[in-house]
């Protein structure tokens, strides 16, 4: 008679009926028997009730230990591998499908924010999730989302960089949560409503911290951007991809203000982000009858999405359907794995899990 033990993966136990009742068969070769509860229970009080109570005690002890560990941990859900297999349907070998929440948990976003080449990519992905995909995440993925966001805010407060970028991210998330919290009873958010109200208060506190940042001058006295030749100053400005950064840089010094109004600088910025067809539809002339490229840029930004470019992105292998960070290895059987990899923008990453 087979008996299934506590571990469902075990082959079970062999029991044999004797004159004294059912006994567990210990060794097939020796033919010896062993009493299941003889080590801690007398034979007279042996019963099914004792067996079930011991099993329930073990399960309860394991559950209490797990609850204590979960209550003490505030870190991100950890997974050893830095890649994930993306499957969208069930097969004989693999059942189910990969979700956005699973990918968000298993990919190394917590470490990625520490890399300046991947920071903007992760922030843009967080913004897209906050806009429309927050309800598609599981409970652990939503908790993971808030933990990563907290690390991003702490990093910005420490480095005093990318302040405006994180302000916009927090405002987007707060606006989305205000809409979702009002829809109580429709199962749009995982968890208690009071927990999400507390998280919204935390977001407001982060916004206050970012607004109160006072950028201090560096202690060392060396060359500044105003001490450089004009050609180098223009070269630095041409590497800025956001027109708002050009405006802010022009407000730092009178000499930089003159350079920030350069028509050729704004023309190249428009041509970098937008196509010729888009530019022709939004032509604006100045009082002198010339194209006002600065006004055209801000007009185009309101009408069309800007070009996105990141140092390091996520990539999908077309051969083995594995998603990983660019530059990291993954188990691939292709002869040339690099030729099979396709870079994904943050929006492409989200679209990958839309079924």
Curated annotation (Swiss-Prot):
Q: Which UniProt keywords apply?
A: Cytoplasm, Nucleus, Ubl conjugation pathway
One Gene Ontology cellular component term attached to this UniProt record is:
Z disc
- The motif Bipartite nuclear localization signal: which residues? 280-295
- Motif Nuclear localization signal: where in chain: 62-67
Which compartment or compartments is the protein found in? Cytoplasm; Nucleus
In the record, biological process GO terms are: cellular response to dexamethasone stimulus; protein ubiquitination; response to denervation involved in regulation of muscle adaptation
Q: Where is this motif: Nuclear export signal?
A: 169-173
Q: In which pathway does it act?
A: Protein modification; protein ubiquitination
Q: Report where it is expressed, by tissue.
A: Specifically expressed in cardiac and skeletal muscle.
Q: What main location does UniProt list?
A: cytoplasm
Functional description taken from the UniProt entry: Substrate recognition component of a SCF (SKP1-CUL1-F-box protein) E3 ubiquitin-protein ligase complex which mediates the ubiquitination and subsequent proteasomal degradation of target proteins. Probably recognizes and binds to phosphorylated target proteins during skeletal muscle atrophy. Recognizes TERF1.
Protein's UniProt name: F-box only protein 32
- Species the sequence originates in: Mus musculus (Mouse)
